[in-house]
């Protein structure tokens, strides 16, 4: 393990692509965990805690490993070399690339537009709630 501290955003992609894995032993319940997503977009497996956003972003045994115990961490770190980095990057790009996220946002905005076509006050006047 080599901790280098903060790095510039320009150097981050190259650094993550060349990393064996990203370790995310956070004690914070991450609501999204951008660091894990960034690593996986580069094809780098993630070894992380098994709560918060990690349960949704790190597919166990495919994109990395989620850990409960010290032994889980040891096993996960030792097993990352068995994961296919191209598969990790492909799945991550399908889920979190700008294009993929943009399509989901577009769908949500279109749904909101349809729902509130007559304005925000329409629901209030009909007694409906959002």
Indicate residue ranges for each PLM-predicted region:
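Acidic donor-binding loop of glycosyltransferase active sites
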Residues: 17-31
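C-terminal "capping" alpha-helix adjacent to the active site of nucleotide-linked donor transferases
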Residues: 65-86
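Short alpha-helical segment that forms part of, or immediately flanks, the ligand-binding pocket
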Residues: 13, 36-41, 55-56
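Short glycine/acidic-rich beta->alpha loop that forms part of the nucleotide-sugar donor binding site
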Residues: 30-33, 40, 50
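Short acidic/histidine- and often glycine-rich active-site loop of Leloir-type glycosyltransferases
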Residues: 50-61, 65-66
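A charged, aromatic-enriched C-terminal amphipathic alpha-helix characteristic of glycosyltransferases
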Residues: 82-129
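Short hydrophobic beta-strand element within catalytic cores of glycosyltransferases
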Residues: 45-48
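Nucleotide-activated donor-binding/catalytic signature segment of Leloir-type glycosyltransferases, i.e.
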Residues: 1-10
